[in-house]
A protein has these predicted regions:
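His/Asp/Glu-enriched short active-site or ligand-binding loop at hydrolase and phosphoryl-transfer sites
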Residues: 143, 148-185, 220-231
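Terminal accessory/targeting
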Residues: 1-47, 62-72, 188-231
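Short histidine/acidic/glycine/proline-rich micro-motifs that form metal-
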Residues: 77-80, 103-106, 142-143, 165-170, ...
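A cross-domain feature marking catalytic cores of carbohydrate-active enzymes
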Residues: 48, 75-77, 99-101, 139-141, ...
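Active-site beta->alpha N-cap acidic-glycine motif
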Residues: 22-110, 114, 118-125, 133-134
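Alpha-helical scaffold elements within enzyme catalytic domains, especially in hydrolases
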Residues: 63, 89, 128, 151, ...
Length: 231
């Protein structure tokens, strides 16, 4: 009985360990992972996950244009195919577009063939709208484990994560002022900031964006795209 209990305990600990490896934003089993830039330079990379949506893409682009700030948009391939005009607008405004998978399904327990299909289809969809810049990759939900890092490493592709995610830290009930205040005070040089702005229930995050930009600029921060982030 003790032996069975020990085996069960070991299996539980292994499962917990694998879960933590899959969720880590700072480490993966193989290949390159970037979650922040040079900590000695007051630069920050503003990144948005998911979408695009026609309504909110235009709103976000207007905010960025008003404050003359570049950003990196990690887009879902199937929505890129469905809403090419929104993607083209992002490209025309000079922002960077990243690959956030085609289906936005978790990629941790998938075959290499399935993973490559997701990557290739999304890259092709992004290129189809005329975007010619670099396409970085961020996994859906930040989940990785073994096969995804293996495929990315084999293809000489880097995993781009984040170092500051105010929505995750504060929860969904946080107000725009709370999100802005927290982000401005928590930001460190070289941070990669993650925000989700493309959903109807994220009004408070969109409302916080101008405050975040103004607050960080007042502290001397410069905004860059991921590909221009000093490492």
């Amino acid at each position: 009985m003790r032996r069975i209990s020990l085996i069960i305990l070991v299996l539980i600990l292994c499962a917990i360990g694998l879960r933590e490896v899959s969720r880590s934003t700072t480490w993966q089993i193989m290949g390159d992972l970037i979650h922040h830039g040079d900590r000695n330079q007051k630069v920050i990379a503003l990144t948005f996950d998911d979408g695009p949506t026609a309504k909110y893409t235009a709103e976000i682009l207007e905010i960025l244009k008003a404050h003359q700030v570049p950003a990196t948009f990690f887009l879902i391939g199937k929505f890129v195919d469905e809403r090419p005009q929104s993607v083209a607008q992002i490209a025309q405004h000079g922002h960077e577009i990243g690959n956030h998978s085609y289906s936005h399904k978790r990629m941790a327990l998938r075959t290499p063939a399935w993973i490559r299909t997701e990557l290739i289809k999304t890259d092709q969809a992004i290129r189809h709208v005329g975007y010619t810049g670099p396409i970085q990759f961020r996994p859906p939900f930040g989940r990785k484990l073994l096969m995804l890092p293996y495929v990315l490493s084999s293809d000489n592709r880097t995993t781009y994560m984040w170092s500051l995610a105010p929505e995750a830290d504060l929860g969904t009930d946080a107000t725009a002022d709370q999100i802005a205040h927290y982000t401005i005070n928590a930001t460190k040089p070289g941070d990669i900031l993650l925000l989700h702005l493309m959903y109807s229930h994220r009004d408070q995050v969109r409302a916080a964006l101008p405050q975040i930009i103004i607050g960080l600029k007042s502290q001397g921060y410069t905004f860059v795209t991921l590909s221009n982030l000093p490492l």
